A protein has these predicted regions:
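Short coil/turn segments at secondary-structure boundaries
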Residues: 137, 265-269, 398-400, 409, ...
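Intrinsic disorder at enzyme termini
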Residues: 4-25, 29-33, 384, 410-487
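The feature marks the mature, well-folded catalytic cores of soluble enzymes
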Residues: 1-305
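Generic, well-ordered alpha-helical scaffold segments in large soluble proteins
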Residues: 70, 74, 78, 94-98, ...
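Ferredoxin-type iron-sulfur electron-transfer modules in oxidoreductases and energy-metabolism complexes
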Residues: 280-309, 324-444
Length: 487
């Protein structure tokens, strides 16, 4: 059964009952958090990096329409074909047209979350075009008929034994092993010839530079470089928000990205593509296409508050520090982008009605906002989306026209009742006092919260009563002391 955001609560329960999954994530999350902590060991340096990254992203977003036009102009001058796609259907149509024009039977893919967003593999398969993942994590989950569970490390939910089992099941002649180097070498060996066999190479884009028309790709495995240089045709696909103004904007963002994602000062490979192969050059594609996808991004851009979601540089740090994601993993969310960032991006892509359960799946602890390298105020945006999801248009906080979710009358009544009690002290004190006297009648199971916890027993005395008694004792003590002094 495929996961969907509408089934989040069911999927989360299934994940929580899987001890192996939780163990896999516990080890992986601890590792990634430690790596980031080491990379940002100097608090002043961390602040400086994040300050600069935030200011660059905000500046670039403030000029987004102009920068996109400039990017198109520069790319066209460089010989890169630029295509605009309003939605996944248009994006897949563009890619399909290019593939069919070149009579392509295989597309070799570098890392691309946007290709997951548009379900490109599935759509190309309908046309008889094979899409083969070359990122090792993506390759593993593709072999298993699975989906990525993390935007940086797609197979993070699998341990060595599970990877070995996947290879044994899908690769002829594979000898089971738990040696990580051997597992990686097996994947590389099977993929190497595929780069030469592929008719088209496809990649994502980390930064698209408007000043020069340059496409920047960040990676550690070398598959991105091979998939963009060996095939005769290269297609790069990215969201419209990835544009930056100047080439000088890239190094600060690159530093913030790598440190936050994997704890590295720099990645093993950093690719810059400015044109197809020129006369006299020995490698590189003969044709380069850039597909710029909207898919709800321009709608978010029009909202001054929700525009901040477009600052994201896809590092995954918020996921690694989220107490919800680290317990249930990415599949439970049922969306391409899981975790905290997914909760505020997915409503633009799928609508708030479909994703309303995700925005409440948060403790609002603020850890995601504290580690975000571009300082997206994720907790505040989640609260904004919660208001919209629960109160519909009645709250006066319309997030995105046409994407409002239904509100719960029962929950609204409960919140209204609490607000009344909290603003009327006499009523509040009477109600809490009555609760302590009737605690024997309160059931042990109080909804979903107590399905995995023991409901706490109300104290025999309320805080107000304890404070009153303490004040009385203090007054008595003060009075006794005063009497002794007089005598």
């Amino acid at each position: 059964m495929s996961q969907t955001p509408q089934q989040f609560h069911i999927q989360a329960k299934v994940a929580l009952k899987d001890p192996q999954l939780r163990a896999n994530f516990r080890g992986a999350m601890d590792y990634l958090r430690d790596k980031r902590k080491t990379a940002f060991s100097d608090a002043k340096e961390e602040k400086a990096i994040r300050d600069l990254a935030e200011s660059i992203r905000q500046r670039c977003l403030s000029k987004l329409p102009t920068l996109l036009e400039q990017l198109e102009q520069k790319c066209s001058q460089n010989g890169i074909y630029v295509h605009w796609a309003e939605n996944p259907e248009q994006a897949n149509g563009i890619i399909a047209e290019i593939a069919q024009r070149h009579q392509a039977r295989m597309i070799i893919k570098g890392k691309s979350m946007v290709s997951e967003e548009i379900e490109m593999n599935h759509e190309m398969a309908k046309l008889g075009i094979e899409c083969l993942e070359s990122d090792m994590g993506e390759y593993i989950v593709q072999l298993d008929g699975d989906k990525p569970s993390h935007i940086i490390m797609p197979a993070i939910h699998k341990n060595k034994q599970e990877v070995s089992d996947t290879f044994e099941k899908n690769l002829d002649g594979f000898t089971p092993t738990l040696d990580v180097d051997e597992l990686i070498q097996t994947g590389r060996t099977r993929l190497r010839q595929k780069f030469h066999d592929a008719d088209i190479g496809l990649s994502g884009v980390n930064f698209a530079v408007a000043e020069t028309g340059t496409l920047c790709l960040v990676e550690n495995e070398g598959n991105g470089r091979m998939s963009t240089t060996i095939p005769k045709v290269h297609i790069a696909i990215t969201g419209i928000e990835k544009v930056v103004e100047y080439l000088a904007d890239v190094p600060p963002l690159y530093s913030a990205l790598t440190r936050s994602a994997t704890g590295q000062a720099i990645t093993t490979y950093f690719n810059m593509i400015t044109s197809p192969r020129k006369k006299g050059e020995k490698d590189g594609p003969r044709e380069v296409h850039l597909v710029l996808l909207d898919n709800g991004r321009s709608q978010a851009y029009q909202d001054e508050e929700m525009r901040k979601t477009l600052q994201c540089i896809r590092c995954g740090a918020c996921m690694n520090h989220c107490p919800v994601y680290t317990k249930i993993g990415g599949h439970a969310y049922g969306t391409v982008y899981p975790g905290p960032i997914g909760k505020i991006i997915s409503p633009h892509l799928l609508g708030l009605e479909a994703t309303k359960d995700l925005v409440t799946a948060s403790s609002l602890c603020g850890a995601c906002g504290e580690v975000c390298p571009v300082r997206i105020p994720i907790p505040e945006l989640l609260q904004r989306l919660r208001r919209e999801a629960k109160h519909d248009a009645k709250s006066g906080n319309t997030v995105m026209e046409g994407q409002k979710a239904a509100h719960s009358n029962l929950e609204s009544m409960a919140m209204t009742s609490f607000a009344f009690a909290a603003t009327h002290p006499t009523f509040y004190h009477s109600a809490t006092g009555l609760t302590t006297k009737m605690q024997a009648l309160i059931p042990n199971k109080l909804g979903a919260w107590t399905q995995c916890r023991t409901a706490p027993k109300p104290a025999s005395k309320t805080l107000h009563q304890l404070l009153k008694e303490k004040q009385t004792m203090a007054d008595d003590h003060s009075g006794n002391k005063s009497s002794k002094d007089k005598s």
